[in-house]
Each structure stands twice: as structure tokens, then as C-alpha cells.
Amino acid sequence: MQMFITRLAAAAALACSSAAFAAISADEAKALGTTLTPIGAEVAANKDGTIPAYGGGLTTPPAGFKAGDGIRPNPYAGEKPRLTIDAKNMGQNAAQLTEGTKALLQKYPSFRVDVYPTHRSVAFPKWVADNTAKNATKAKTLNDGRSIEGAQAGFPFPIPKTGYEAMWNHLVRFNGQSYEAKYRNLNVDASGRTALATEGVSNQEFPYWDPSKASDTYWRIKLTYTGPARRAGEALMIVDPIDMGTKDRRAWTYLPGQRRVKVAPDLAHDTPNPGTAGATTFDDTFIFNGSMDRFDFKLVGKKEMIVPYNDYAAVYQSKQDDLLKPNHLNPDLVRWELHRVWIVEATLREGKRHVYSKRTFYLDEDSWAALASDEYDARGQLYRTGFAYMAPSYDLPAPYTDMFGHYDLVSRLYSLTGFIAETGGLKHTKPLADREWTADALAGSGVR
């Protein structure tokens, strides 16, 4: 498959400097809402018709959906795969598979990829489109791409020119302004044994998406652990600034045994994530999360790739024991589709430290969410591979990719983060009061 490099993506080859990158011109922005969707995806179908033209996404809930319920029925439940890929026929489809997907097909005979008809189901409220159009000609990156300015309540860079701009679209991706879920994080070891890493309640907010007021915070999360028993009562809070070039992530933990809140500056980058019992790094969260200061991010281009998509069966309808199987998730429950993705390569900066020397990210053109990643070790060998399981909230509407997982190709362990099918699903909520995002409030949230 030929890589589709746009003339804008070609600009990513230019060396980065500390100077600000300029916003796009008004003439360039005219493509939004015409040949491009309001957030920057190609409207047209692909040449073969295997990717349809964008028609506005899915905004009507299917039969069986109950307003206010956290569980969302599968609107495509009756469909059958149009193609099944396994190790035997992988070569015929290799150009549309990530390196991680190919590695899993080669490593595990039971792993397969069931490719279903493509549905461009992602949709957004009109105000997201309107604000994205405003941002397009004003938003800029600063501090080697690690900060942004001139953007609010819309995607900052619908027509990206650099890898940093594309990754900012992912970092601020719209899942709704605020939401809550009871979740489980689970690990499956090389022997096939499933272990609970953590479970609890997650409250997430994106103050960036508040159209009524500007904020210097783009994302914040509060986790209250209810299990396993030895972790019950612990709590964690993270607040990420829009200006990550000059400001650090703020993070706190509460340990009930000590009965005090501690500042936790190390909850970032390649620190092992206690939420997954160390199976992933902190910046593996949501495929990528946090500051971009450890890597150089290059926008490679756009390509048609087979990625997890419309995974309502796995995210909302599955049972834990049915979904988690030895070596990998149950292929019967994972839906893959052909979509256009932006490819961003991240290379470790000289003088910086990280367990990964290189990373490749695959960003969905319709949502800007990272749907897959490949992570390489210090020797340049493929080490881990990650996938996010898109299941849009058609009732809002908004994308949703907070169930994600990583496969460790060395230890043969894999993790699944954000399993919500048996714990009430995802509920969109009103933002918490600012006082709930303080250290004192974190201490009060931890209960045993």
C-alpha cells in the first residue's frame, strides 16, 4: 500500500525549532467543511469504496438504548466479517497492518483479525465543528511543539503540519467534556492467568472543551481505587496543563495507611504505571498521554490501515472471562475496520531517557484518537504494541477510546485498561466543582 503523503505532512520533514509554528492560512482553512470534514478528515470515499464517504457519523441511538444508561447497544450487531486475516494470509494484507498486528499474527496461531465493513460512525456536536474552524487559523504550537496557544473548545490543528500538532489533536481529543466510569484494569500473564491490576472509579474532565471559559488545563483525572483489597482506599489525581513546555504535570496520590496526600511528580513518561501493576508506562495511557518532551514527533503521512473500530461488543457487551483469553483478547469479540489514519513517528531525543527508543502512533482521521501504536526498545526491536477500542457515544455524540490495551511481545503478558462492560459502562456527567480537584478533596475521596 502506497503511503499517502499530503503536501502539509511533507512539512513535518523540516527541523523543529523553539519558534512558534504558524497557524494555517484562511485559504487552507476553506477546505474544512468542504473537501475535509469540519475536524479535518477526508470527506470522500477511498478509490475502492472500502472506506465510505463521510456522512456525518452515527447520531441516532439504536433500538434498546436507554437514555442515561452507561451501556450502549451495538448498532452493527448483525454484521459479519468481510475478511479474516491470520498468519497464513497475512502477507496479502501486510501493507494495511501495523507492525504490532503482524507480530501478534506471527507469534500466536490463535490470533486473527476479523475485518468488518467500515462505518465512519464518529460524530461531534456542531459547536465542536464551529470552534475547530475558529482554531484552525489561530492555533499555534510553542516550545518545540510542547505547548499550544490560540485554541479553545475545538480541535487545535485540523490540518496538521507537524507531528506535534497531530499529537495535540489526540491529547485534547473530544470524548465529551466530563465523564465517569467504574472500571477494571486487567493483566493476563504468559501462562494465561488473569489478574486484577486495579479497579475503581474514574472521573475525567477536559476543561479545554468548555466553550464558556478558557482554561490553562486541558485534562484532569481522579481515580479512586476499590480493589484489589491491598489497594482499596488509594486515590490518584493528575492535572495536565496546556503549556507543557514551561509547566509540569501536577499529580498527587493518597495512601490510606499514611492518611495523607503526597505530591507525585514522577507519575509521567516511562514510570511504570501502578494502575496496570507496572505492565505499561504512564505515557502508554490512552496509547499516548502527557508531555512530548522526551521524543521528536514526525508527521509521516496518512495511510489506509486496519485498526480496531466500532468495538461495542468488546467495550459494552462482553464478559471478562469471554474477552480475556490466553495470549490475546478473544478474536470473536474484537471488530477491526479499514480506516484512514495519520501516522506519527516519535524518536527519542538525544540526551533524553525512556524505556522506548522509538514509537509509531496511528491516529484516526475522523476522531484524532490514537487507535494503535508500536513501541521499540533500546535495541530497536519491537517491544510492545498497543490498541484502543473505539466505541462512539452516539447519544452525545462523541468518540470513546478509553478501553485500550498493550501486548508485551517479550514477556508475553498483555494488559487491558478501562474494562467497563460489567461495571455499568460510561456515563457522561456534569463537571465537578473546582474544589473537588484539590489535594484535600483527594484525601476525602479515598475510602476503604
Model feature map: region roles:
Residues 17-18, 25, 110, 121, ...:
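Generic serine detector
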Residues 26-248, 255:
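Solvent-exposed N-terminal domain segments of exported/luminal and surface proteins
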Residues 74-82, 209-215, 294-300, 403-420, ...:
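Short, surface-exposed, charge-dense and proline/glycine-enriched linear segments
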Residues 4, 21, 65, 111, ...:
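Phenylalanine-focused residue identity feature
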Residues 167, 175-187, 194-227, 231, ...:
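Extended beta-strand-rich segments in extracellular/periplasmic secretory proteins, especially
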Residues 422-448:
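Long, C-terminal catalytic modules of enzymes
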